[in-house]
Amino acid sequence: MALPAARSALSARAFIRPAAALNAAASSSRYLSTTTPRHDAPVATTPGNSETALPVPLPGIKFLSMPPVTPHPPTHGIHVATLHLQAHHPYNLDLVSQFAVHSAHSLNIPTSLPAFLPREKSLYTVLKSPFVKKKAQENFERRTHKRAIKVYDADREAIDLWLRYLRQNALPGVGMKAYIHEWVELGFGRKEAEGQNEIEMEVEEKRIQDAAAELVKALSEGEGEDQAEGVQKIVDAAREEKPAEKLKEEEAKSS
């Protein structure tokens, strides 16, 4: 009667051993999940555009943005300035672009919405270790994002005030460059050229008068070889456009 009991004990022991082995395998394996339930982590709320997302998604993060605004329409369509923005992080670039459009809207300056310019890529190859080995190299890519805002029908003083306000409240890491167009009346270049020609003629006439006065003085005072040398110096000075006072100083130093 002892044999059935022994068989039942052996069968029970054989049934328990695989479970123990399974538990040992589960405890030693790092790829199997534990039996405790896990709650799903909240998904980060990122904007629809992939360019404006942060490089590292964080749970529950709130992106700083401004309310949408419609720029003032141009009254005459005269292009007076263009603001170029560029940065390596598109989120900061979009924030500064929105800030520029809002500030121009507050100053009643007609502008366009920020235009997306072509993205610039730069590839850099550096050593992966401090040792000079050809195989131990690493490549890095740097992207530069760019935006452009056009300004219309605004006074120069208003544009200077707007640019100064943007410079005072600039965001680190975002570069700004403005191209300002000045409109003048027709014939402005001709007037500038005429004024320049008049100044040159006055200077040339004065130089000739000084050279003639020095020549007359040398002819009246000098004799022989000294007279010829004095005349030659005055002629050379006139050719080199040297004033009479400078010529006198050189003569005093030589004597």
From Swiss-Prot:
Residues 236-255 have a biased composition (Basic and acidic residues). It is found in: Mitochondrion. One of its GO terms (cellular component) is mitochondrion. One of its GO terms (molecular function) is structural constituent of ribosome. GO terms for biological process: translation. Keywords: Mitochondrion, Ribonucleoprotein, Ribosomal protein, Transit peptide. InterPro entries: Ribosomal_uS10 (IPR001848), Ribosomal_uS10_dom (IPR027486), Ribosomal_uS10_dom_sf (IPR036838). Residues 30-52, 220-255 are annotated as: Disordered. The keyword Metal-binding does not apply. The keyword Ribonucleoprotein applies. Pfam families: Ribosomal_S10. Part of the mitochondrial small ribosomal subunit. Belongs to the universal ribosomal protein uS10 family. Involved in mitochondrial genome encoded proteins translation. Involved in the binding of tRNA to the ribosomes. This is Small ribosomal subunit protein uS10m. The gene is RSM10.
